[in-house]
């Protein structure tokens, strides 16, 4: 199959069986809709959605896929679920994704992000049709030295807090499984993907910047911010998802040539401080939106994080399409449409279509 480099190819995905963990989460719901729009046969395995409202429910994501509620920490259930489906492609996104939550719940964070990954990969070993595995970690998996040149894929794993550390551990698990069990000609090809702070319509999670901003705007309250100078690699959710899909395509077609770690982050100019994000969203929202500073002492969060994505650009021909200003306007527009009662399934598919074209 001749594919154009750097393009998510809908004819490749048509009728491919894709097993997706974490499909009820924010990124998982967007990816489920994108796969459905290309006529992939999708089975999701995840906990119940973790907020009310949530994108999975509001955009009727479960209508065009098989959806199983389960915990990746349950080896028997995840193994049976995956084996019964016998996928062509596996994308592992299920995780405990929050830094501050990980301080309160370190055991749950490690058991989900480390042993959960072991369980998913262990289950994958038994699937005879499986050719391509993409396991998602985070930009926070790197040992954060505060360098501002951008972390490269070969930089050391680390993590100051339990969440970041658990994702560094997951990367070590993926690397060991790749070399031990997924390196023969007859096995699936396994890669990891590391992305930054994803943003987009339909994120209602606790303790995340954009949802916190939108909740305050809705109530006409000022947004209270703890680290206005904190810089993050912000990117629209469809940017890394396009990277995951491109990577999965290449693993399926070209095998071990692409079986390694990959960074998917925004352009340098989109690594902006929190205060800049707030100012843009205040303008887009209108209606007297505002923000103020939280003076309480807060747990440590890494002050500077940036990814070097030149490898993905050179070898996968993946590059970000939307700048941050555009993305923030789209998020405000998405949320205001939601408040007006617009059909959010159609709204998401329209956004995916706009991204592709």
What function would you assign to each model-found segment?
Residues 1-195, 199, 338, 348-350, ...:
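N-terminal Rossmann-like NAD(P)+-binding domain of SDR-like oxidoreductases, especially those catalyzing
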Residues 8, 73, 104, 112, ...:
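Residue-level signal for the nucleotide or nucleotide-sugar donor/cofactor binding architecture
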Residues 145-150, 154, 162-163, 168-255, ...:
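NAD(P)-dependent short-chain dehydrogenase/reductase
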């Amino acid at each position: 199959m001749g594919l154009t480099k750097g393009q998510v190819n809908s004819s490749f995905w048509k009728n491919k069986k894709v097993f997706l963990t974490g499909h009820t989460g924010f990124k998982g719901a967007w990816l489920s809709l994108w796969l459905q729009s290309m006529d992939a046969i999708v089975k999701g395995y995840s906990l119940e959605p973790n907020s009310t409202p949530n994108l999975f429910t509001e955009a009727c994501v479960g209508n065009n896929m098989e959806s199983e509620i389960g915990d990746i920490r349950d080896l028997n259930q995840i193994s049976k679920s995956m084996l019964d489906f016998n996928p062509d492609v596996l994308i592992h996104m299920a995780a405990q994704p929050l830094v501050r939550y990980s301080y309160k719940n370190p055991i749950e964070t490690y058991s989900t992000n480390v042993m959960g990954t072991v369980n998913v990969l262990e289950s994958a070993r038994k699937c005879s049709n499986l050719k391509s595995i993409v396991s998602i970690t985070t930009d926070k998996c790197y040992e954060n030295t505060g360098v501002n040149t951008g972390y490269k894929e070969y930089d050391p794993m680390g993590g100051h807090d339990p969440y970041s550390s658990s994702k560094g551990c997951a990367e070590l698990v993926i690397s060991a499984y790749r070399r031990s069990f997924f390196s023969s000609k007859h096995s699936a090809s396994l890669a990891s993907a590391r992305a930054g702070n994803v943003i987009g319509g339909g994120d209602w999670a606790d303790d995340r910047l954009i949802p916190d901003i939108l909740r305050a705007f809705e109530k006409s309250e000022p947004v209270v911010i703890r680290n206005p100078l904190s810089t993050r690699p912000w990117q629209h959710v469809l940017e890394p998802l396009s990277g995951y899909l491109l990577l999965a395509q290449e693993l399926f077609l070209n095998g071990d040539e692409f079986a390694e770690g990959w960074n998917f982050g925004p352009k340098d100019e989109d690594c902006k401080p929190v205060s800049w994000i707030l100012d843009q969203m205040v303008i887009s929202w209108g209606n007297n939106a505002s923000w103020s500073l939280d003076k309480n002492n807060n747990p440590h969060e890494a002050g500077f994080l940036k990814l070097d994505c030149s490898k993905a650009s050179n070898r996968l021909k993946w590059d970000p399409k939307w700048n941050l200003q555009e993305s923030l306007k789209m998020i405000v527009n998405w949320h205001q449409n939601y408040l007006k009662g617009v059909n959010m399934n159609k709204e998401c598919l329209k956004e995916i279509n706009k991204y592709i074209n």
